[in-house]
């Protein structure tokens, strides 16, 4: 994929994020919008809402997105002076914060599709119907601006491609990756266990110790073959060392 194709895919995914936001606003009018960029694997949008999104909610939101695509809404760009921009976004506190963060004299642009308008630098596709192959994948928490002192928002992740074939190929890859997830395999093979007493720290079980020691033995063999020697250092040291 060349740079032109990558840019086109990124634009498509960015537009998919706006369609996601429009669908959420239709189904949950009280939801407040944060940001919704394209990313390397697809797109996401952050929402501030009292509703805790579930897997079933994602299915409903995706169905609404498909309706918006079928409506073939024109996506139009326009700009406004700062005062008018803030009036337009008066009910969107996160958008107001973004506007306030723009430099004086900066262009403030919006994109409109049907009843939905979002603060955005773009670019976007011309019509919603161009976003044909997409899928919502998951929902997770995300702090506003990535700062734990700010409110926790809900981030919906999705992906989009130029064709259904590409989308299906990607979704199949994700399914295969899940089958090979070390957390899944570790439990199924009895390699290790996790406990709330040490979140993120595995407790190796007998099968896991056999595998771990086999890997360590191989590691030692390779290092010895190439002339390396082994040392051992303390686990805890004074912080001034760093």
Predicted regions and their residues:
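Auxiliary tRNA-acceptor-end handling modules of aminoacyl-tRNA synthetases
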Residues: 1-11, 23, 32-35, 44-242
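A short beta-turn/loop motif at secondary-structure boundaries
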Residues: 37-39
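Metal-associated gating/positioning segment near the N- to mid-region
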Residues: 26
């Amino acid at each position: 994929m060349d740079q032109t194709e990558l840019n086109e895919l990124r634009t498509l995914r960015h537009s998919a994020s706006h369609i996601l936001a429009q669908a959420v606003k239709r189904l949950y009018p009280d939801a407040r919008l944060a940001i919704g960029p394209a990313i390397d694997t697809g797109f996401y949008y952050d929402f501030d809402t009292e509703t805790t999104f579930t897997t079933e909610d994602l299915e409903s939101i995706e169905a609404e997105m498909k309706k918006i695509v079928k409506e073939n809404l024109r996506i139009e760009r326009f700009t406004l002076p700062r005062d008018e921009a803030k009036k337009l976004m008066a009910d969107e506190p996160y958008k107001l914060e973004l506007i306030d963060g723009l430099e004086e004299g900066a262009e403030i642009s919006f994109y409109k599709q049907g009843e939905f308008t979002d603060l955005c630098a773009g670019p976007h596709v011309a019509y919603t119907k161009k976003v044909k192959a997409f899928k919502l994948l998951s929902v997770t928490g995300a702090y506003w601006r990535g700062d734990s002192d700010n409110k926790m928002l809900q981030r919906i992740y999705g992906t989009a491609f130029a064709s259904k074939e590409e989308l299906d190929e990607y979704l199949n890859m994700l399914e295969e990756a899940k089958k090979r997830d070390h957390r899944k395999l570790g439990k199924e093979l009895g390699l290790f266990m996790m406990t709330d007493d040490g979140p993120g720290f595995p407790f190796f079980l007998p099968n896991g110790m056999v595998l771990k020691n086999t890997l360590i033995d191989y590691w030692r063999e390779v290092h010895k073959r190439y002339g390396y020697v082994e040392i051992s250092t303390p686990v805890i040291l004074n912080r001034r060392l760093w």
